[in-house]
Amino acid sequence: MVSAEVPSVEVLSAGTLLEGTEVRIVDEGRTDREERQVGEIAIRCESLFSGYFKDPETTAQSLHDGWYFSGDLGFMADGHLFITGRKKDLLIIAGKNYYPQDIERIVSAIPGIHPGRVVALGWDDASIGTQRLIVLAEVESESKVDDPALAATVRTELAGELDCAIDDLRLLPHMWLLKTSSGKIARAPNLKRFLEVFGKSAP
């Protein structure tokens, strides 16, 4: 039995597999995982591409024994494929794995935070041997920029939902965060901007 108090999130199916397509869900060692366990999605089919153009290194990393290791994370359940995120985006904080989308969803729902204008980032800190968690969140009004009460609420909500502590939280004015050409919040460019703007005061 699972308590109704346990936080959950709805995940939509990407659909069932096309005829002639095989999918495996694998761990870091590329060993198959059980159904409903999250891992990297590997695909094999007759129409699979043979490699990346003039990029043998990426080809060798992604293609092996007829399988394409996509870098996407997901799981299989009752014949349906569910995609949960990107492997490269996974945050590893003090030995625990966190999906940035989970952090962003929780913070976005807090009153005073601009919905959908939050990004959770991992910054590799060699001095402690793990990533530090950075959360950049745009606020709905200028009066909430760097507001200590709102910052405390964000930290408390995240700790309560995910048992996760933020190393560096920035409450920012609207339109501070950078987006991709498709309108999504851009992770790498925002990490770069964070380090350029706040680098000297970062933990």
Give, region by region, the residue ranges found by the protein language model.
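Conserved C-terminal "lid"/linker of ANL adenylate-forming enzymes
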Residues: 117-124, 134-135, 155-203
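AMP-binding/adenylate-forming catalytic core of the ANL superfamily
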Residues: 45, 50-51, 73-162
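Short conserved micro-motifs at the rims of enzyme active sites and ligand-binding pockets
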Residues: 53-54, 146, 181-182
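Short, solvent-exposed cationic patches
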Residues: 54-57, 105, 200-203
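Conserved ATP-binding/catalytic segment of the ANL
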Residues: 11-36, 40-100
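Alpha-helical "lid/cap" subdomains adjacent to substrate-binding clefts that gate access
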Residues: 1-13, 139-141
